[in-house]
Amino acid sequence: MNLLIDKITKDQLRSDIPEFRAGDTVRVHAKVVEGDHERIQLFEGVVIKRHGSGISATYTVRKISNGVGVERTFPLHSPRVAKIEVIRHGRVRRAKLYYLRALHGKAARIKEDRRKAFK
């Protein structure tokens, strides 16, 4: 049974996903259906967590919009996500950045990982 599930999900995995992790700033191009037409909506922010593996992997992106923190969780291999762009790599020492929820302004900044920026 497990081999069957692995075989089915392997076909669904996307290969165009860039390498990113918590602390990186990403721009997600999400497909949004409004009525009878579909458009692309951009969501740019800091990845605060990645969860799971395989077809069920997800990641959460946080941004500040009009002074209010907005977090959105996306499935990693979803066809509703048109493209993921990595804007900059952040240097953090945690896998889950929940502490950013309590920080405001300049305190919520993340240092850039210069070693990854040149690759």
Curated annotation (Swiss-Prot):
SUPFAM superfamilies: Translation proteins SH3-like domain. PANTHER family: LARGE RIBOSOMAL SUBUNIT PROTEIN BL19M, RIBOSOMAL PROTEIN L19. It comes from Pediococcus pentosaceus (strain ATCC 25745 / CCUG 21536 / LMG 10740 / 183-1w). Belongs to the bacterial ribosomal protein bL19 family. One of its GO terms (molecular function) is structural constituent of ribosome. GO terms for cellular component: cytosolic large ribosomal subunit. NCBIfam families: rplS_bact. It comes from the Bacteria. Pfam families: Ribosomal_L19 (PF01245). This protein is located at the 30S-50S ribosomal subunit interface and may play a role in the structure and function of the aminoacyl-tRNA binding site. GO terms for biological process: translation. Keywords: Ribonucleoprotein, Ribosomal protein. This is Large ribosomal subunit protein bL19.
